[in-house]
């Protein structure tokens, strides 16, 4: 079950960590072909997670961030980690369902602790919604490819890109909002609850990022109205959020919708126009099922549905008064800070 080429390295890890050369039991938890390998192993009667990273790239940042999170009580205890061998052994979390009302308090509390840690290393590539704020050839190519693909009708694509330009024009990258980020919390499987404590797992995408990125992607799964938003943000900030914090949070939630709509529509459709005849699930219902692990994004059809769900929700949000109000609030704060008002691009 262990890849043959990693057998010796796993044996060394077991020996260094537990003084044994084999485990008592093993269960393969690998999600799908091409994924990092994951196994539940039993050693001396206790369960651990053995992870073998198969994706290319330096593991140093991943393991550094994972260890920092574990030291802070946010991630399971790290028993063994070898960046050279790309292997880690951590405590295994026997997860139970975390209901959304409980998550509204537990998750922002955990994120507050995470974002207060010493700075994380940078990453070679941004795989989060803040990628849309990184001007340069990579972003230009990403957007040009989407526009040229005609995945969505031209008028819808242009509306999305126009609104995106408005957000990008006013959403300044503030040093005060940069914080250690997990950056992969749109996947519910990376948020585990053992019945007593919350654990954040899989730190492969961790790096220093805008604090609102983590907050937004989780909120897009579990925050369904303004009352829940207040609970969520008050738990994070430790006090009622002001209008500027709520505006930045709201705009980041829209950036997340944009990012996942474009990314997953592109992945799921292989860059071709999508079939619009199939009905789209109601956003809140879909995210409720996604949060409950009832929906998998493994195949292209599921990816397309996920992208469409985000696009439909974004389409509704773009026409709400709060969208323009959030743009105004953030733009006005920029004017105070810079001494001049940021002009918003107009929507055609």
Regions found by a protein language model. Give the residues of each.
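Short, surface-exposed loop/helix-turn segments at secondary-structure junctions
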Residues: 276-282
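Activation segment
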Residues: 55, 95, 198, 206-208, ...
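Catalytic activation segment of kinase domains across protein kinase-like and atypical kinase folds
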Residues: 189-215
């Amino acid at each position: 079950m262990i890849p043959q080429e990693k057998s010796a390295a796993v044996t060394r890890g077991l020996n260094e960590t537990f003084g044994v050369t084999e485990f008592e039991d093993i269960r393969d938890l690998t999600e799908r072909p091409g994924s990092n390998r994951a196994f539940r192993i039993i050693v001396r009667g206790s369960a651990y997670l053995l992870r073998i990273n198969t994706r290319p790239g330096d593991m140093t940042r991943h393991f550094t961030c994972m260890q920092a999170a574990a030291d802070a009580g946010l991630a399971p205890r790290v028993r063994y980690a070898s960046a050279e061998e790309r292997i880690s052994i951590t405590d295994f979390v026997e997860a139970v369902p975390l209901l959304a009302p409980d998550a509204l308090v537990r998750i922002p509390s955990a994120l507050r602790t995470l974002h207060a840690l010493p700075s994380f290393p940078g990453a070679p590539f941004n795989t989060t919604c803040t990628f849309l704020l990184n001007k340069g050839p990579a972003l230009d190519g990403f957007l040009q490819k989407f526009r040229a693909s005609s995945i969505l009708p031209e008028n819808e694509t242009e509306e999305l890109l126009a609104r995106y330009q408005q957000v990008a024009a006013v959403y300044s990258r503030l040093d005060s909002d940069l914080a250690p980020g997990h950056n992969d919390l749109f996947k519910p499987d990376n948020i585990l609850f053992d019945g007593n404590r919350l654990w954040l797992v899989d730190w492969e995408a961790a790096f220093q990022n805008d604090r609102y990125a983590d907050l937004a992607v989780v909120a897009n799964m579990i925050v369904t109205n303004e009352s829940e938003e207040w609970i969520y943000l008050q738990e994070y900030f430790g006090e009622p959020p002001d209008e500027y914090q709520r505006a930045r949070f709201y705009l980041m939630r829209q950036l997340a919708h944009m990012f996942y709509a474009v990314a997953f529509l592109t992945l799921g459709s292989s860059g071709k126009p999508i079939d619009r005849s199939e009905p789209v699930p109601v956003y809140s219902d879909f995210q409720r099922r996604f949060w409950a692990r009832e929906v998998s994004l493994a195949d292209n059809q599921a990816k397309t549905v996920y992208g469409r769900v985000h696009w439909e929700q974004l389409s509704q949000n773009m026409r709400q008064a709060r969208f323009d109000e959030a743009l105004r609030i953030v733009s006005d704060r920029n004017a105070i800070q810079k001494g001049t008002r940021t002009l918003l691009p107009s929507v055609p």
